From Swiss-Prot:
This is Beta-crystallin B2. Residues 17-56, 57-101, 121-162, 163-205 form the Beta/gamma crystallin 'Greek key' domain. Crystallins are the dominant structural components of the vertebrate eye lens. Keywords: Acetylation, Eye lens protein, Repeat. The lineage of its organism: Eukaryota, Metazoa, Chordata, Craniata, Vertebrata. GO terms for molecular function: structural constituent of eye lens. The gene is CRYBB2. Residues 102-120 are annotated as: Connecting peptide. It comes from the Eukaryota. Has a two-domain beta-structure, folded into four very similar Greek key motifs. The modification N-acetylalanine is found at residue 2.
């Protein structure tokens, strides 16, 4: 869902991260603004997170202090209540936050044999720890269902070659969220999963705009 008033990509400059946290739903109550990582929101005077407005981002929130526990990814946009940023139903608590660094791979003027691997987003997910077993490789695409692509295995290790991604426990971008920044995750504990289950994945793009959050409750 792109903003209606975007500059051409070639002229856009990445904005400094900025997020507003409201203690009540629908952007009511005391407001606290952050422009950098906060390992404990209570130490910053935030008693409760009821709604969130991301002016520039993206960001990741955590259930526990020191960026631990369940993860919640926030892109630029409005999140009026907790079920607009998650549908895992396990927790509505956010205790720490940090900005996500979105690193773009350099674009090449022409696709050649030498530059064909310079994709902006590339991730490989493996069945077993230490990058073994069956795998699914995703390049410059969002995948709402691994099963639809013929991959029905567990995901125990992940290698992010470029871009920033968020994986989900269930198809359709539902369930627990797992942030994947560039690098290697040798087993599921390294990306914060209690069980090696990921069934959908999408790219994080800092110019994306969510008017009412990433989730749309049926009620």
């Amino acid at each position: 869902m792109a903003s209606e008033h975007q500059m051409p990509a070639s002229k856009q400059q990445p904005a400094s991260p900025n997020i507003a946290i409201f203690e009540q739903e629908n952007f009511q109550g005391r407001c606290h603004e952050l422009s950098g990582a906060c390992p404990n929101l209570k130490d910053a005077g935030v008693d409760k997170v009821g709604s969130i407005l991301v002016h520039s981002g993206p960001w990741v929130g955590y259930e526990q202090a020191s960026c631990k526990g369940e993860q919640f990814v926030f892109e630029k946009g409005e999140y009026p209540r907790w079920d607009s940023w998650t549908n895992s139903r396990r927790s509505d608590s956010i205790t720490s936050l940090r900005p996500i660094k979105v690193v773009r791979a350099p674009r090449q003027p022409l696709p050649t044999r030498q530059t064909k691997d310079s994709q902006e987003h590339k991730i490989v997910l493996y069945e077993n720890p230490s990058f073994t077993g069956k795998k699914i490789e995703i390049i410059d695409d969002d995948v709402p269902s691994f099963h639809a692509h013929g991959y029905q295995e567990k995901v125990s290790s992940v290698r992010v070659q470029s871009g920033t991604w968020v994986g989900y426990q269930y198809p359709g971008y539902r369930g627990y969220q797992y942030l994947f920044e560039k690098g290697d995750y040798k087993d599921s504990s390294e990306f914060g999963a209690q069980h090696p289950q990921i069934q959908s994945v999408r790219r994080i793009r800092d110019m994306q705009w969510h008017q009412r959050g990433a989730y749309h409750p049926s009620n």
